[in-house]
Amino acid sequence: MSLGGDAKIIGGSPAVFKAKRGGAIPAPKLLDLYPGAAAAYSLRKLRNAYAGAAVRIRRSGDNAEYDFGFTGAGDFDTASAEAFCVAGGGTKNGYISKWYDQSGGAINYQQTNGSKQNQIISNGVVLTDGTNTKPVIKMEANKGLVTDSNIQVFPSKIGTILSVFKNTASFGTICATYQAPSGVDWQLDSSTATIGYKWYSSGGGSTKIAANLDVTTFQTQSQIRTSGTVMGIYTNGVKLQDLTIGNDQQSANKVCLGSFQIGSVPSGDWLVGSFAEQ
């Protein structure tokens, strides 16, 4: 997921670039090609210069926590994460206590309440979407993440929200800074047939678009604010509609993932499904 900036989805396989004096230099990753994101989260490495972890995992056996990063290829280090949870014994499950920001802005998603943490490992095995071996974070009722500090997603009334997810329930919030109907805040949600965007300003308002979401596959959803009053809604790179929104500068707030936000605690409109590695 990417918040703010001008990030775009890139298709195809990465190339390997050869240095002039021999050897290989790594192919540019998403944030190398499209820098400037206010925050970015993934189970895949998004920036070659990023040296931090992907996530912090709490294991169920003894509640110990540890940071896990990436392999040399930039994939999530599933082997180390699985071994950590197995060593803890018990149910051998793993839960996300922190999802690290790879943009360099250090605005991390976190959940300190163990009962609300999203699962990533079950019985010692990293969860996948069932069609390949790519890791996913499971989204379900009463579980969600929230940024550890405020973020301005639409600086100067321009910005992009990009997410890759699968929704298997009738309704759920992808991400939001929903504080109250009278504030300058927003909520992005989806059902198994629609994608919706709520822009709360001067009394509020919302728009839902029939997007024919395929619940059996992951969807790439993008919301691109190009001016004060125009918000473009895209599914898998195809524009669905330009929405007319209030010409307001959104407040810098904490962003909630998987539910809407009351204060700083995830609460309600839970997303049921999963987030993919990017």
Model feature map: region roles:
Residues A49-G61, I137, I174-C175, N253-G258:
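Short, hydrophobic/proline-enriched secondary-structure or compact coil segments at domain edges
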Residues I57-G69, N142-D148, P181-Q187, S202-K208, ...:
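Short, surface-exposed beta-strand/loop "edge" segments at domain boundaries and coil↔beta transitions
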Residues L43, G88-K92, S97-K143, Q152-V153, ...:
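Extracellular glycan-interaction surfaces
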Residues S156-G159, F275:
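Extended extracellular/luminal ectodomain segments enriched in beta-structured repeat modules
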